[in-house]
Each structure stands twice: as structure tokens, then as C-alpha cells.
Amino acid sequence: MSIMKKYIHNWDELTAEQQAKAKEQFKGNPGLNASVVHPAAKFFEEHKWVKIDRFIDRNMANLLYHHVQLEAARLNYLEEKNIEYSGDTYGIFNDTQAPGDFSKYGDPIMDTLLSLSLEQMQTLTATELVPTYSYHRLYTTGTELERHSDRPSCEISTTLCLGYDNSNVDASRYPDWDWPMYIEEKDGTKLPIHMKPGDMIIYRGCDLKHWREPLWGKNHAQVFLHYNEKGGEYDIPYDGRPLLGFDASFRSEESLTRQNKLDKDLQERQAKEYVTENKVIDTSKKVIY
């Protein structure tokens, strides 16, 4: 919810004149005073996205980058040796959004980052939030993320750059090349947003279409930290799990039923705005670096 909605529950029902008067009356409240509201929160409220430089430091990003690489190598070993495993525990290579790349839901260390980031996220968005889940991937050469929007459990999302290997890209022609995420704003503007390890984008994934063009580099690791508005339409703490750190199999039947309905309703609304294509997707594993 917006800054004012925290205090005035029928905010959307007020006229523009009433809203202006309420803002004037609340100027003395430090929680609403523009002088103490984080600049990122002001930008986020207007644009529905904001980039945060160095949300985590480079050393932490590098640690998590190597953690993801090790997870991918471990899963690759299990597959090559034909050892039976659980995708909930070890991750998968067949996520249809990034087919062939390593992906994992609700990893304990990433869910810990999700939880520890909550207070800062509330400051950066001026919104009361509940954490839902984390999801991370190790993208590889040629991966393309098609233009899409997210499901309701990703109401307010972050994509945090952990690290990458672009050593195969010709630095003399493309110095300091990185892999931007594109966001389409409501006015149709298409923005490439560049990130270095530790940088993060906060965005309303259900409202804004976003995508990436094919990756030139060898690999690129990102973690998504997903939150919902506390008390809002999509308020399902922990994505329906009893605690953070559990895999998706622990989502309750009640939450799945509610989530499926919310997904369907949102998809119907989005379908009126965007046309999607049905494609055959190859989910075979790609080369792991």
C-alpha cells in the first residue's frame, strides 16, 4: 500500500481535494514527511520500479555467486551419473522460463537474505510487506527471458545481481559489457537497466512487463526476492509455506487454491493488454560453466 494508505484505509475513495488536504494535515508525521521518506520510495511510487546500487556488498555477492555455481555443478554431476535426486532439494534444469539453466526455489540462504532484507525493502518502497519466496538462477550463453509479467506472489519483486562471467565477450569492442534487464513502463517506454554484482532492481512485477535479450556471456547469476503488500489482495506469507527455507512441496493446499484463483484473475486482466504466443520449449540442460 502507498504511504498514505497505511494511515487512511479508504484513501482510494477520497477525492483529489480530500487527499491533498489529508497530506497537508499529516505533514507533521515523520512517517509521511517527504523530508524523511527515502528518495527511492518516491521514485518507486511514481514509476513502479527503482534501481538500488550495492544493495549488498561485492564480497557477499561474490560468495552467493560461487554458491550458485557450486549448486549448478552439483546438480550437473547428479544428472551425468544418473543419480536420482529431488528437484526441490537440488534445483532443476527444466524451468520453462529459462530452459536448460539451473534454477532453485526457496533455498535457505536465499530465503534468509529475503527475510533480512525486509526492513530495508519497506524503507525503499514505503510499503508494509510480507516476504513470500526467493528464487535464483544461473543463466548461460544464449538464454533469453521473454517479455512477461509475474504471478501475484511476486507483487513487489527484486532481481539482485550476484555475479557473472563475461570473459568470452570481446572487451575491445564491448568494454564493461553487462546483461541489462528491460522494463516497459506504463507509457510504453522500454528501459534497459544495467547491474553490477550487488546491484538490485525493485519492481512491481505484476504491473510491468520485463525481459532480457539473449545473454552473450558465459554465465550470469541472479536471485529474485519476492514480497507482497501486507494486508493486500495478494497477502500470502511465505508463499503458503509454514516457514521460509522450505521447498515448494510445503505450500499448503489452502494457499495453492487461493493462489491459483489469483493467478487466473491476474492472467485474465493481463490478457486484455498483451498478446502472448504458444511456443514449444526445449528444456534440455545446457552447458554448465
What are these regions (language model features)?
Residues 3-11, 16-124:
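Non-heme Fe(II)/2-oxoglutarate
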Residues 35-52, 128, 135, 174, ...:
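Catalytic phosphate/metal-binding cores of nucleic-acid and nucleotide-processing enzymes, i.e., regions
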Residues 51-53, 130-132, 202-203, 224:
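A structural signal for short, well-ordered beta-strand segments and their strand-loop junctions
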Residues 59, 96, 139, 148-149, ...:
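Surface-exposed loop/turn and secondary-structure junction residues enriched for glycine/proline
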Residues 93-103, 112-175:
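Conserved double-stranded beta-helix
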Residues 141-207, 219-223, 229-243:
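Catalytic core of non-heme Fe(II) oxygenases with the double-stranded beta-helix
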Residues 212-217:
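Short proline/glycine-enriched turn/loop segments at secondary-structure junctions
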Residues 219-289:
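Double-stranded beta-helix
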